[in-house]
Amino acid sequence: MTVEQREASRLGPLFDSCRAENRAALIGYLPTGYPDVNTSVRAMTELVESGCDIVEVGVPYSDPGMDGPTIQRATEAALSGGVRVRDALTAVESISKAGGRAVVMTYWNPVLRYGVDAFARDLAAAGGHGLITPDLIPDEAQQWLAASDEHGLDRIFLVAPSSTPERLANTVAASRGFVYAASTMGVTGARDAVSNAAPDLVARVKAVSDIPVGVGLGVRSREQAAEIGRYADGVIVGSALVSALGDGLPSLRSLTEELAAGVRQRNSP
């Protein structure tokens, strides 16, 4: 990570604080509008109150090519309920008011429709810290690179085991805040066994930068959170939290507290 990346990052202080506590950050994802807008916003503030360090606010999209079945079902329900991009910004504002840190996770098309600079402006105004863009590569991100600089937002790009050394280095150099390491190939979703490719991918990023690395796509338990927290800077959980929310807010709260305990036991056997 360059000096510029470190100084400009809105999430940098959070990762510094977690490092000082010798633990990984817990990063939780929920889609806006599931099961309805108000409940989804309440659920996201529950994540904050239950120990989630960063909340990924999902923008439902009609063609979610990288999402597993759990998240696809939730986003379809949200879209059927009429969720809008503006609702995601409302969620960001609520998370910020609750003392949390929010990043938006969205496919690129909704941002283009909204207007790239306008979206960055409104996200920053809502208290957002940055944007995760799973289907946008830095080579095609000139508008977003400019808008994120203009409005002081972190930009979180994805790397995968299939990333070539050149692509990985370019992606890491363009990222700010953290890099999202997809620990399994293909779509996301909770799995019983976390991919063995994840430690290797984190090591590849660490070989070219000291930017924080978040690992996602598979975590569902306290034990898995602890396992990933031993080598990653952030443990990303999505599908398991969406499933828990389907069982109600108490279930979501319980799982989040378990995961928060998991990232804090990274040095335990």
Swiss-Prot record:
Cellular component terms per the entry's GO annotation: cytosol
Q: Which InterPro entries match?
A: Aldolase_TIM (IPR013785), RibuloseP-bd_barrel (IPR011060), Trp_synthase_alpha_AS (IPR018204), Trp_synthase_suA (IPR002028)
Reaction it catalyzes: (1S,2R)-1-C-(indol-3-yl)glycerol 3-phosphate + L-serine = D-glyceraldehyde 3-phosphate + L-tryptophan + H2O
Q: Which Gene3D superfamilies match?
A: Aldolase class I
- UniProt pathway annotation: Amino-acid biosynthesis; L-tryptophan biosynthesis; L-tryptophan from chorismate: step 5/5
Q: Does the keyword RNA-binding apply?
A: no
Which of UniProt's keywords are assigned here?
Amino-acid biosynthesis, Aromatic amino acid biosynthesis, Lyase, Tryptophan biosynthesis
Pfam families annotated for this entry? Trp_syntA (PF00290)
- Active site, UniProt feature: 56 (proton acceptor), 67 (proton acceptor)
Query: Which GO MF terms does the UniProt record name?
Result: tryptophan synthase activity
EC id = 4.2.1.20
According to its UniProt record, this protein's enzyme class is lyase
Tell me the SUPFAM superfamilies matching this sequence. Answer: Ribulose-phoshate binding barrel
Please name the HAMAP family in this protein's record. Trp_synth_alpha
Q: Which PANTHER family match?
A: TRYPTOPHAN SYNTHASE ALPHA CHAIN, CHLOROPLASTIC, TRYPTOPHAN SYNTHASE, ALPHA CHAIN
What does the record give as the function of this protein? The alpha subunit is responsible for the aldol cleavage of indoleglycerol phosphate to indole and glyceraldehyde 3-phosphate.
On assembly, the entry states: Tetramer of two alpha and two beta chains.
In the record, the note on similarity to other proteins reads: Belongs to the TrpA family.
Q: What is this protein called?
A: Tryptophan synthase alpha chain
Provenance organism: Mycobacterium marinum (strain ATCC BAA-535 / M)
User: Gene encoding this polypeptide?
Assistant: trpA
